[in-house]
């Protein structure tokens, strides 16, 4: 499976030392130039994450005015490359990507997939680590993801 990612999932996974999960979950991970720039202060992108130049931007004022450069370029690149998944955490960006016919997954979905594939032993410690770094997870979503992972007590 191929993926295009925005900045925030890469930064979040790097902060909890789980960026390598992307290599285990996807055959290729691609980011647009804006994501490479946005992540540069925090994440040294490994060689297996490809920075791919955009040939066109989504011709939509909504995308350009409502989202940051990383989200706008990630959505545009996904429309161009048609990956299996576009990795986005921002809810409005996720809604737009889905409206445009893209298959979206976020950081929690990635961790859930990793748990289901046996790549991590438990989801709760990873989610708690995310929260400790300042990553916001609504309590209802936290519980829902634990239910899906079979870890809610």
Regions found by a protein language model. Name each.
Residues 116-153:
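Long, charged alpha-helical interface segments
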Residues 107, 112-119:
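Long, charge-dense
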Residues 62-66, 111, 133:
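Conserved short-loop catalytic and cofactor-binding motifs
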Residues 1-85, 91-94, 98-103, 125, ...:
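Active-site-proximal, substrate-binding regions of enzyme catalytic domains
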